[in-house]
Amino acid sequence: MRGIALFVAGVLVGAAVQATVAQNAGAGVVGLNHVGIAVPDIPQAAAFYTEKMGFREAFRNSNPQGQPTAIYMQISRNTFLELQQANAQRPAGVNHFGLHVENMKTAVDMFRQRGATATDPAGPSAFSGAILSNVTDPNGVRIELAELGPNSLQRKAMDSWK
């Protein structure tokens, strides 16, 4: 039941993001890329989303012991669910949502001009190869900006979608 509630929350975030994307047309925001949730048991969560929801595993990151620390589940060509390990700094539940941006500098400049605080872009990510930045809304919700270059794992998963 909790998994379904998290999924519904992600869908609602997606609807809100689509309105934002429409308002930012031409400013480099492509759309919702992912919803990130922290879970206490990544393999169990991945099994649920694969077997019950029909999502496919796009890619994963594992620690040196081979245990997954993050798994991207692909919902559609352009939309993912990021499963992350819950811990003391990242409690279980919806953790953030990610926007796909065409050009990180353009997107960061636009959000800063509008008064939002955006971190300086970092990248490419050692995990996914994407260039990342973060904006935090007034309620503390983290919005991850992701520029998906041709070698990023997200881009490769999107390109392989059938």
Language model feature labels by segment:
Residues R2-F7, L12-G14, A19-G28, V30-P40, N61, I71-Q74, A88-R112, I131-T136, ...:
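Vicinal oxygen chelate
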